[in-house]
Amino acid sequence: GQHNFISDPRRYDSVVYSVTGKRPVVWGSDFSFNALGGNIADYHHCGPMNLTSPWGECRINGLSTETLRQNLVDEIKQRHAEGRIITLMWHCCFPSECNDCDGASIWTWQNRPSNEVWKELTTEGTRLNTQWKKQMDTVIPYLEQLRDAGIPILWRPYHEMNGVWFWWCNKPGENGFKKLWIMTYNYFTKVHKLNNLLWVWNTNAPRDKKGD
């Protein structure tokens, strides 16, 4: 039930039901991003919010960020009323691009932020740190709605941070990913009082064992 796409929030539930006759207890989705550029089809599989479901032709769906995220909140309220456990993630652009970027801004194999850029991001009051807060502020109102509705969320931001593919990956040490994680926790929990979030440290794990 995890990672139903924000533009097609019932697709995977329907697939599971068609095979098993049962609905997953865990229901999940993604705050996502708007894919830009000439290679949007390369990122269709992860469900950019401005694209149609990856099960069909890759097309722009014409819906706004605000509409899609509000629809997500409404869907979550329905699923929670059914007794489902809700989990949310976020494939987010680099903060300077907010919600609209080429997918290569997220899947940055070769051009992850330099140590200097990372330091600016995680230093209070810098230009990039301010842009990061503005980016966070684009999803916080929707999480506040869920808090006010009494809905707990398994919140797993910056997933697979021990990999090498996302812009937030492969930043060890006290001033690396750990600092970004604590900064995010403090901003959501202490500044915005989002006490309905259960924070999930979502590492990557190999799919198989060598030689198995």
Give each language-model segment a name.
Residues 1, 25-29, 86-88, 153-157, ...:
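Hydrophobic faces of well-ordered beta-strands that scaffold small-molecule active sites
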Residues 1-33:
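Boundary/entry segment of secreted carbohydrate-active catalytic domains
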Residues 3-11, 35-37, 63-68, 132-135, ...:
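Acidic-and-aromatic substrate-binding clefts and catalytic sites of carbohydrate-active enzymes
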Residues 9, 13-18, 185-212:
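Surface-exposed substrate-engagement region within the catalytic domains
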Residues 32, 36-194:
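Substrate-binding cleft of extracellular glycoside hydrolase catalytic domains
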